[in-house]
Regions:
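Beta-strand-rich domain onsets/edges
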Residues: 1-30, 45, 51
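Beta-strand-rich interaction surfaces with strong enrichment in secreted/lumenal proteins
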Residues: 7, 48-51, 73-76, 99-102
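Conserved, single-site charged/polar hotspot
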Residues: 8, 32, 52, 64, ...
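Solvent-exposed, conformationally flexible loop/turn segments
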Residues: 11-12, 104-108
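Hydrophobic beta-strand segments
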Residues: 33-40, 86
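Short, acidic Ser/Thr/Gly-rich low-complexity loop/linker segments typical of extracellular
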Residues: 42-72
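A short, solvent-exposed loop/turn motif at the edges and junctions
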Residues: 71-99
């Protein structure tokens, strides 16, 4: 894949974006936060929009330039989405810089940003969030092979008698045998949404989106039920 194409391709179509800003501690909305959006695929990386959040912690929905719709519907095309950086700041919170937000044509992207409260000092802190290129566009290492039949260990925990949709999914941020990697608790709904956003494009036909999300849910629930 030739990533140099991204700096030269045209942006004839339009997608939309709304940013929601919350406190990481209690998920309360943060009003009057400043949101700056920059296009990463132009030479000057100029500011595309500067917005403020309302009393609900939301910006207005804005229009942003994107590549042609056909790119996301045709395999092996140029980058099918516009890449934007989002910087969010608010008094009393660390500034958050999100790099690589992906905006597709003809669909609305909703980006949640959770700001970290400052520790009570005047020190200026920031946190960086990098979004990797989409799995359908970039090249990634193949999935680690797994044994078709696995040994079931006696953990002493209760074994589910039927498939249950969990409230949270535990995400292991590392290789399966890396005990030093951290685990994160993610709500089931957010986990499915995040996986779907990484595996398919929102511009696909509705039937294709349904089929892929059902496959993602089936795989996830199988992992939970079998404790793999």
């Amino acid at each position: 894949m030739d990533f140099s194409l991204t700096n030269n391709q045209s942006f004839p179509d339009i997608g939309t974006l709304q940013v929601n800003v919350f406190s990481q501690n209690n998920y309360n909305p943060i009003p009057n936060a400043t949101v700056i959006i920059q296009n990463t695929q132009t030479q000057e990386s100029s500011v595309a929009e500067q917005l403020d959040t309302d009393s609900s912690g939301q910006t207005e929905t804005i229009s942003l330039k994107t590549p042609p719709l056909e790119y996301s519907l045709t395999p092996e095309s140029s980058m099918p989405y516009g890449e934007y950086n989002i910087t969010v700041s608010a008094p009393g919170y660390e500034t958050t810089i999100l790099t690589g937000a992906q905006i597709l044509p003809d669909v609305k992207a909703i980006q949640d940003i959770r700001l970290v409260p400052l520790p009570g000092t005047e020190e200026t802190l920031s946190q960086d969030i990098d979004i990797d290129p989409h799995t359908l566009y970039a090249e990634y290492p193949p999935k680690i092979p797994e044994a078709e039949i696995k040994t079931v260990a006696d953990t002493g925990e209760i074994i589910l008698s039927q498939v249950v949709i969990p409230e949270y999914i535990i995400v292991h941020d590392g290789l399966p045998d890396d005990n030093t990697a951290p685990n994160y608790y993610v709500t089931y709904k957010d986990y499915i949404k995040n996986v779907a956003c990484s595996e398919i494009y929102a511009t696909w036909p509705e039937s294709s989106i349904y089929a892929n999300i059902l496959a993602i849910m089936s795989f996830t629930l199988n992992r939970v039920y079998t404790e793999w």
